[in-house]
Amino acid sequence: MAKEKIILTGDRPTGRLHIGHYVGSLRRRVELQNSGLYDKIFIFIADAQALTDNMENPEKVRQNVIEVALDYLACGLDPTKSTIFIQSQIPELCELTFYYMDLVTVSRLQRNPTVKTEIQMRNFETSIPVGFFTYPISQAADITAFRATTVPVGEDQEPMIEQAREIVRRFNYIYGETLVEPEILLPDNAACLRLPGTDGKAKMSKSLGNCIYLSDSADEVQKKVKSMYTDPDHLRVQDPGKLEGNTVFTYLDAFCRPEHFGLYPVSYTHLRAHETVL
């Protein structure tokens, strides 16, 4: 009997989802959901993991669980095709995390590139919450509990999945072939790996105030688009513009397709060809 093809993916409910999430993961989840290539798709809202750096504000996490669920539905994730669940409602995941802790050393967690980056971003370098530090172990529990064969992630999360694979191999070595070792599914479009903020900074972030949220109204979206960073040296219409570092063109790459430019000559078959026209 062929092994079931199972996807598991999710988000920490630390805030409303924005178009960076859509480009980076949500759009692809919908495509995978509708592809018919997978037997089961599990998408979870990782509220327990969100508490690891939001313990002082559980109400924020609780409210964001609802916001993320609404964003999922708005993007096209279909509960009749994908199983959407809340992490904290499955206590066995915490139990499995506890047992997996015996298979991982502190030094190995410290070497995880994703963990090191996240610690620096959150200024945890002198005092790290244990729950946050062991986040990769919790993620391994999520993946293996549902016997996921495929985990779609961005390149920045690849070390986390590799850590899960290490845990699986060690567990199976000790206890026999029990757990499924997941495969990593990376984005196939380089332009969609990470969408910059509207101010041109490398990352779209709520704390930086440079997000366009999926739940923004039409007026809010229009206001944010009109204020986007473009080319500060392009002062007059007749001045030549620069494409490099121009956030607008990055967004066009992410959201537009050649068919969106039907009014332009048919010889322009790729979005990049339209940049000279625009």
Regions picked out by a protein language model, each given a short descriptive name:
Residues L73, L77, T105-R108, A145, ...:
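Hydrophobic/aromatic-lined pockets within catalytic cores
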Residues N172-A202, K206-S207:
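Feature 926 captures the class I aminoacyl-tRNA synthetase adenylation module centered on the KMSKS loop
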Residues L17, M55-I66, L70-L73, T83-I90, ...:
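Conserved phosphate-binding loops in nucleotide/dinucleotide-binding enzymes
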Residues H270-L278:
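Single conserved hydrophobic/aromatic residue that forms the stacking wall/gate
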Residues P265-Y268:
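Short, compositionally biased segments
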Residues F124-I167, F171:
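Internal, conserved structured core segments that host functional sites
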Residues A2-A141:
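N-terminal Rossmann-like or analogous alpha/beta NTP/dinucleotide-binding catalytic cores
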